[in-house]
Amino acid sequence: MRRQLLLLALLCALCGAERAAAQYYTWGSDPPQKWSAIRTPDVRMIYPDTVAGIARRTLFYIRSVRPDIGYGFRHGPMRIPFVMHPENFQSNGLVMYLPKRVEFLTSPAVDSYSMPWYKQLVAHEYRHAVQYNNLDRGVIRALSYVLGQQGSTIGLLCMPIWAMEGDAVMSETMHSSFGRGLQPSFSMAYRAMGSVGRDRRNIDRWFCGSYRDYIPDHYELGYQICSYAWERYGENIWDKVAWYGSRNPYVLATTRVALGKFYKTNVIKLFRETFDELERYWDSLPETGDSAVPLTALPEKNHTTYQWPLPLGDTAVVALKTDLDRVSRFVVIDRRTGGERTVCHTGLVSTRPSMADGRVWWTEYRRSTLFEQRVNSQLCYMDLADGVPRTAERQRNTLYPTASGEEFGWVEYNPDGRYTVVVRHGEGPERRFETPVRSEIHGLAWDDRTVAWYVLVTDDSGMWIGRIDSDGLHPITEGAYITLSNLRAGGGKLYYGSIASGRDEAHCYDLMARREYRITTSAYGSFAPAPADGGVLLTTYDRLGYRVAEQRVAADDSLLIPVTPSRLPVNLVNPPRKRWDVVNLDTVRYTRADSVGQSGEFRAKRYRKVPNLVNAHSWMPVAFNPFAAVDEHVIDLNVGLTLISQNLLSSAEAYASYGWNRHEGSLVNLGVRYFGLGVRFDLDASYGGNQLFYSLAGRDGQGNPVYQSRPAPDKYYSVGLSATLPLYFQRGYHTRQLSLSAGWNYSNGMVADLGKIEWENGSISNIQRVGFREGLHKVSFGAGFSDQVRMAHRDIAPRWGYTFSANYTFNPENTHFSDLISFYGQAYLPGFAPHNSVLVAATYQTSIGGYKFPSGYAPLSYKSTRLVPRGFTSADIVSNNYTAFQANYQLPVWYPEGGIGSVIYIKRIRLNAGGDYAQFRDVGRGGMTWRRIWSVGGDIVFDFNAFRQPASATSTFKLSCYHPSSGG
């Protein structure tokens, strides 16, 4: 029976592992704060009190869009809670099961378009709630009664992720004036690549990504296919795909069958038709070239991105550079030769840099020390003279730093949704300029000629530019649903990116003449203009990436192209598509009257954390440990029942199981984890099975083995509690972690009573009368520290990194038990070629104190399983001066980018060659002697994607072959 259950679990894992990776997700804990909830007939808003206003506004948008959000599907959105996280600058949103909820990161995205962030989130994420509701029908709904929400997740296999995201981007686009899918940059990579649809190789690379080349993500791909299918068939094809799949989940490849059954098509045909049509449309557009002169060359097969170029004198440029081989770093480019040098590596940059007097300022995303859902935007700086990146103290909520001679300005974002422009003159006091409520700031610039600060604003009217001072915010341009970006200023002009012409181009606004001009003409796009002597520095895009370029500007502005104000950009690069008959969220206004009316209709109540810690969302008719299955990939199944719980705040997880097998009888297990205070607490308890014995063995006078007699075993039980303090120190290019832990465990194991041993002629004379003591306590303390650098797209391990840890374990109740002390260290080093990796590791452990035989052997001792030579188990070693070493060399050997179409796509094959060596003192016939074991061999590792899952769901499969040897 257990073998059959295990086989069933493996088959389910093969079918659903990738989708589970996206949906079985622990979001991470927020810092401690007070929470409230608003319940309506359709949704429940759960939010910290600091964002009560944002929660009310978001609820208003949800209720406004609800009648239309299910457009094209036969069922509307499911009833689902929305959980808001206000202290994470890495803006995002997710809809997931286990438990069912919508997660909103409320900090507006830095790189956004002309629709306010909360409207974007509602239009996109609430559409996922529609998809989930249409998949949770028929057989899938029946499975949810058997398995809880785990049963509903099986329905997610019946609609591809790229289709779900593409349909959600369509919703986001159709519920706005000029939304995400219509942005020129959203199709730019495909336009630059050319013949995507005629690619006759395995098309899975376009769905699953590549290590060879840059591939647009599944949002961009999904939108193009979904929008074409709507136009081609005149309806939402995914409605029937979801309907068929939810009622026939036992059919292999439900998407393929449904598309063939209802539309006489398939994914390959849709893909090729989509991009054939797009290419024909793009080829019909007037051909244009780049007016800007490139300053850098881009290599083949290493998609390169230069960002935010800034002038450094007359002969050099400072820019941020990233490519597939290396992470982001600041480089200095010689304008005359195109040569460059690296100045310093950075962390994940959040907003564009600024430079004055040889110092570069920028901001980076930095996770807080304790809480995963507190991610700051940290102000950083670097002097070009020494190239050392530094962190500015107490500047964690900073955006758009702007250096301007004696003044330095930045934008502060408060978790309650308010933006403030802060200006400091030298060492003087700060001046703070508040911005209007319900507006977002997406840029800051200082103009030396008008001696004023300017901001880029997004609100219900779209995007516009304003001047800010102590009297408030004064509009310079009118609001329009035209995306503006990367605001800079100088010489009486504002410079920024704009999509007014239908492509991303560099624009400027003459503050004296009050006129807007287009500076560039581009084949695909020009970005991030910055004024330089006699011209403008910017980046242009082509199939190889973003390159630094320079646009010369005539002194009389005769080369500038006047721009006529408009509420919408030219829809140039998108083929005609019929719009949905849905509400345009750009026309929805949340007023004070709406706030008062909603507060009266739906009152907020305190959301108590303790009563909501337990939230049983799933159950299974088998007994297993889900923590071990996820963390250690260990699946031990028994007949029985398992309940799984996770609270909506992602601060507590738990499971309880009852199982039975014929060897051990009834088995009861409980596991609880809590993360809400920064310290992680783990509680585990078990009951059932046979009591464990820690008994003695010896030899009689003839050398034959003699074992201690055991009484009949009782039922086994154990309980354990541990606490771990993970401290996270993110410092740009380096991420350091310090972990402190303490744990206690008690079990009713039967331990040999060593105090009653009698020795005669070097052997135990009363081994059958020694007896046992019930109960085994284990207390452990540990500390670990690691430091690793960021990994590039093609890296298989960090180029540099190290880990050190030390642990101490003892039994406080039984002095006959030896204490265990152990140390471990490992290091990552670069190999002989790019993306080759060397891993070396070493460990030492030994037992100290406790009862020892005359030979020196400690019969009662603990062991660490860290670094046991491959091919051996912990039963083969003794924790007596145990020393082990390991060395591995790993390298990529092939990027096949092929496989079985739509089933498995192999992206990369890696080879690892390794060897292990260990030695320790063990008891022998002549007393304690050194024993040595070793192993050599290798691993073949396949990086693959199953069932056209996106690049983020890449998995690994490893084949290992090692030759162990006792060595002597």
Name these PLM-found stretches.
Residues G181, H303, K321-F330, H345-V349, ...:
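A flexible loop/linker signature enriched in serine peptidases of the S9 family
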Residues N690, G698, Y707-S709, K756-L911, ...:
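C-terminal outer-membrane beta-barrel translocator/porin domains of Gram-negative envelope proteins
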Residues T369-L370, D504, A523-F527, R543-Y546, ...:
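Outer-membrane beta-barrel translocator/channel fold
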Residues T26-A37, D213, K240-G358:
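Beta/coil-rich, acidic/histidine-enriched accessory regions frequently appended to metallopeptidases
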Residues A22-I154, P160:
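Juxtacatalytic substrate-recognition/specificity segment
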Residues D30, P116-L121, A129, N134-S227, ...:
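Acidic/His/Gly-enriched intrinsically disordered linker/tail segments
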Residues S284-T304, I333-S350, Y381-S404, R424-D447, ...:
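Multi-bladed beta-propeller domains
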Residues E287, N302, S558-G678, R769-R799, ...:
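Outer-membrane beta-barrel initiation region
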